[in-house]
Regions:
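N-terminal charged segments
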Residues: 1-76, 88, 93, 155
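Conserved beta-hairpin
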Residues: 32-35, 94-103, 175-190
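A conserved beta-turn-beta hairpin within the catalytic core of GNAT-like acetyltransferases
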Residues: 44-51, 104, 196-203, 213
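Acyl-donor-binding surface of acyltransferase catalytic domains
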Residues: 60-137, 239, 263-265
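Conserved acetyl-CoA-binding loop-helix of GNAT-fold acetyltransferases
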Residues: 63-70, 205-210, 214-227, 231, ...
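Conserved active-site tyrosine of GNAT-family acetyltransferases
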Residues: 96, 249, 254
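A short, well-structured alpha-helix characteristic of acyl/acetyltransferase catalytic modules
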Residues: 135-148
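A conserved beta-strand-loop-helix scaffold within acyl/acetyltransferase catalytic domains
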Residues: 153-209
Length: 270
């Protein structure tokens, strides 16, 4: 990997680590462990959306780092997701396999500088995006995300996570912004979020309810968030793209720079 690509990959990882640890660092019943080799986030509930391990560097100690993270959640009987930036070496892969984790998704890490972006102004008729300003809207955000998991235990705990967040003041902090897309009748159908870190702003959680997909709502959410960011930020913007969303981000000016593999242990999953 080229030096420039390595640097951008590190920025993407750092912003992600800030995002997934932001609530846990200041919430009762949650915890964050950080070493030079990994970061572990325990949300205090059996939900792999928020119980996260990040392998920070694939080096001589990566095998032990993977083992420490997977053993921790196994002892708690909690599901977890393990996020690994490529290149991922053979020893880490072997330990991941030995721990019983399976590959759940592969995302593309992408970046762009504000000066290179020109968001589209298009907004579908009968649809609007707004930044969340009330505890009730935080709960709506969680309700949309939880619907992506059907009737599973994961869905219940995702909803509970945002109910607890709504009771705190963390969602009002400037580091994090939550957005919700609603229809004219007030029905929430799409969500998105941002996270500010030392070197970048990250875009996350772009998701639309199944029955409202293919109508441009997710794309409109992304471009609205991007427009908001550009009103106050003139530097680096990062995100992670699934295969389905990569095209929208590339057309907007984002460049792929790294692959991120997400593994899950499946403990507690219905």
């Amino acid at each position: 990997m080229k030096e420039m690509d390595q640097r951008m990959s590190a920025y993407i990882q750092h912003n992600f680590m800030e995002k997934v640890s932001f609530v846990a660092r200041e919430s009762e019943g949650m915890s964050v462990q950080t070493t030079e080799q990994y970061m572990l986030v325990d949300c205090g509930m059996p939900a792999d959306t928020f119980n996260i391990g990040v392998l920070r560097a694939d080096d001589a100690g990566s095998e032990g780092a993977v083992r420490q993270m997977t053993d921790y959640f196994a002892a708690r009987s909690f599901p977890m997701s393990l996020w690994c930036w490529e290149p991922l070496g053979a020893s880490a892969r072997q330990e991941i396999e030995h721990a019983g984790l399976s590959l759940a998704e592969v995302n593309e890490g992408m970046y762009a500088y504000a000066e290179d972006l020109s968001p589209e102004a298009y907004m579908p008729e009968g649809f609007a995006v707004k930044q969340i300003r009330t505890p009730g809207e935080v709960e709506q955000f969680g309700a949309v995300l939880s619907c992506l998991f059907g009737e599973s235990s994961e869905a219940k705990h995702v909803s509970l996570y945002y109910e607890r967040l709504a009771e705190s003041q963390l969602w009002t902090r400037p580091e994090m912004a939550l957005y919700i897309g609603v229809l004219n009748d007030g029905t929430p159908v799409t969500v998105g979020s941002t996270m500010r870190s030392r070197d970048s702003v990250g875009i996350y959680d772009i998701a639309t309810l199944d029955e409202y997909r293919k109508r441009g709502f997710g794309s409109a959410m992304f471009h609205h968030i991007l427009s908001d960011i550009l009103t106050w930020h003139d530097g680096l913007i990062v995100l992670q793209a699934s295969e389905a969303g990569a095209g929208v981000y590339k057309r907007a000016g984002f460049r792929p720079v790294c692959a991120i593999r997400v593994f899950e242990n499946g403990h507690g999953i219905e």
